[in-house]
Regions:
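Terminal domain-start leader segments
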Residues: 1-307
Length: 307
């Protein structure tokens, strides 16, 4: 399908779900600055290949918001797609919520995996003020099947303590102390750099970064990494077992959170995606939004070895 055909297919699916608009951000479920091609949904639906942009599709319009760094590129790549460029660096350019409140009605769909908790809640509040309803629906994945790049499966490997200067056990002890101070028994981590730092692991899932696509849930008596089994060879299994890390499949993080037992849970609302938040066991009513996360705070203070 070309871009025009994809837009037609998306609008058909929107109609089926009873939504009047769909927002497709240029992000991934981990709020990464650089992401794997599997999640380049904004580019797939618009044809724009720049690193920063957000698409909005209604039943009769398609628009792309991007900043002034990409105006020339967007003008060239959007030709023939029916997608209109919205120059968000220009002073008279409306924000996406402003435009939606002025030009559509009813409900707006977003994939909750592509929005942080904070971003989702802020968008929801603004849209509701304008009389619109925000719905959590993934409308791109059902359409983008053929030719979609797989989630990368580079091998997980240990980043040795002689380079990190601190053991996983020590880092987890400090994290659990921060959890205790907030009266929480669980912490959800989705930022890939934080996971790599906490568990002393690395990967090659994203070009030019040593990241490994995964989630982590830290509890008071265990720590679980959610990662594709294809990323784990014998050495990786041995390392994770040695440092006491439990292993679950990447997609199992949602069902794990649904049955998680804790009185309180911590998360960084600027990084953790809305789908993870929505999956948390509803019995856990104490939900502490910390930004930045305790892991990022610790990561930012370098020890002598790292210096």
């Amino acid at each position: 399908m070309n871009i025009v055909d994809r837009l037609v297919a998306l609008r058909t699916l929107m109609q089926k779900h009873g939504v009047n608009a769909c927002i497709v951000p240029g992000t991934d479920p981990h709020a990464s600055e650089y992401m794997a091609e599997h999640w380049t949904e904004m580019s797939w639906i618009t044809g724009f290949l720049g690193e920063t942009g957000t698409a909005v599709i209604t039943m009769d319009e398609a628009l792309l918001w991007t900043d002034s760094r990409y105006y020339l590129q967007a003008e060239a790549e959007l030709q023939g797609t029916t997608v209109k460029l919205m120059r968000e660096s220009d002073i008279d350019c409306p924000t996406i919520p402003q435009w939606l409140c002025q030009h559509t009605e009813g409900s707006v769909a977003v994939n909750p995996e592509m929005y942080s908790v904070n971003g989702y809640r802020e968008l929801k509040a603004i849209l509701e003020e304008g009389g619109l309803t925000l719905k959590s629906i993934d409308l791109i994945s059902p359409l983008w099947q053929e030719g979609r790049p797989a989630i990368p499966t580079s091998l997980l490997y240990e980043y040795e303590e002689k380079y990190t200067g601190e053991s996983v056990e020590s880092k987890l002890q400090r994290v659990r102390q921060a959890m205790t101070e907030r009266r929480c028994q669980a912490l959800v981590i989705s930022a890939l750099d934080e996971i790599g730092w906490l568990l002393n692991i690395r990967g090659k899932d994203v070009d030019y970064t040593p990241c490994l696509i995964s989630y982590v849930v830290v509890e008071m008596d265990k720590c679980t990494i959610f990662v594709s089994p294809n990323k784990l060879d014998a050495a990786a299994h041995a390392y994770l077992n040695r440092v006491g890390i439990s292993i679950c499949d990447y997609e199992q993080v949602f069902t794990y959170l649904q049955t998680l037992q804790a009185e309180g849970i911590m998360y960084d609302g600027g990084k953790v995606n809305e789908a993870l938040y929505e999956a948390i066991n509803p019995a856990i009513t104490r939900r502490v939004n910390v930004s930045p996360s305790p892991v990022l705070k610790m990561q930012s203070v370098k020890n002598a070895t790292e210096l």
